[in-house]
Amino acid sequence: FMQIFFIRTIKEGYTGCPVIVRFIQLQTPTTQKAYAAVHKDYQVLAKSTSGGAFTAIADAVFAQDGIVYGVAMMDNMQVKHIRTSNKEEFAVLRSSKYLQSDTGNTYQMVEQDLKQGKTVLYSGTPCQIDGLRHFLGKPYERLYTVDIVCHGVGSQAYFDKYLDFARKRYGNIKTLRFRSKEYV
């Protein structure tokens, strides 16, 4: 039933998850390339939750006077995409968030940066990357994207309800880590 539903909706113009759409359109398994990496600097590795690969890629972009967009947990526990232009600003993008982030006006900002000749790195879920590409309407040679593995990320609204529960039970929440290395 599920496959029939997706095939029917694709024919009717379904534009949902790009991974599901691509899989159903192909209808045959394809070989994909996958890469694994770990940052060489132990300090970066210790501050990162997924090996520090994003930091290494971002460093290469910053070395070209480029711009890096990624997801930050704001002080109010909202998860948002932000623009960073140096390593100091980038530090808040480290660590996993496990929530669908608010892209805000970052697509417009990316377009502006690209039109100014900047190298741009944008990290997000596959649907966010697909949304960025559709927004831009054409490929850009200086745009690099990192699609994080999506496993059905949770919504901010649901997370806010959890935070309300946690605040009532434990009091004020100062920091939050989804994958803490404190006890490793």
Show which residues each predicted segment covers.
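Iron-sulfur cluster-binding cysteine motifs and their immediate structural context
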Residues: F1-I10, Y14-P29
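Iron-sulfur-associated redox domains of electron-transfer enzymes in respiratory
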Residues: Q25-V184
